[in-house]
Amino acid sequence: MQRSHLGGIIASLVVLVIAGLLVFAYQTRDKNGNNAPITAVGSTALQPLVEAAGEDYQKSHPGTSVTVQGGGSGTGLSQIAQGAVSLGNSDLYAQEKKGINSKNLVDHRVAVVGIMPIVNQEVGVDNLTLEQLTAIFTGKITNWKDVGGNDQKIVLVNRAAGSGTRAAFEKWAMNGATSKEAQEQDSSGMVKSIVKNTPGAISYVAFAYKSSDVTSVKVNGIMPTDENVENGSYPIWSYEHIYTKGQPTADTKSFLEYMQSTAFQKKYVEKLGYIAMNKMQIDRDINGHVTHK
């Protein structure tokens, strides 16, 4: 009886030790970033690319979970600065966003996004100068006939204040001017839908949202194409940034390296309407200074 009782105690202790080791191993893996879930939040312009990367990465890395959410660049930068997510996606440099402590944020550029004005197909305009765009979005021009279009009231559709696409558009299309107060939308997809269905509407979206049901507007006579961004002739574009708080964990670093790899850039970046980093013939810093490679 005593021997049997002792054996039971030993067996129970063995089970407890094994369970403890398993819990410790799990906690260690999670702490070190191995197989920990990856959550990316922010730019809706960058969202389709990160979603494609996440889906593909999970197939080749079983056990890794990649969750991608929009919300705009401001949300992404705020969340990553707080350490609430793994990755913060942004169309602008963290230093450009007011209220963001960028000191501990590390920038990983993964693509370039062109941004184009779009208008409802009935306005009768397919080309605008930077000066005209500024006048329209600041409310100085309110009728399409004043820029060569139909006699129709201009309806502004803006991205939300925290949008990186909006910040990039105001910086590079409007020379830093602030858009007039108008209806705002959180996503590029919704913006495109509203412009399509609203007479007189104008807004702006990333090239990835280009479609035949709205008119893509030339800027200073230059078509919004990848080639024209690459050679520097088209002015409205931005780098797509993914920020980490400090150096990335092992899994997060692996995911970022995958997105920056030649294989991924060739397979997905251009296919989804972005511009590969290695295709750029110029480099532009945060102040707009351009150097040719």
Walk through the language-model features, giving the residues of each.
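Exported/periplasmic ABC-transporter solute-binding proteins
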Residues: 2-74, 78-82, 86, 90-293
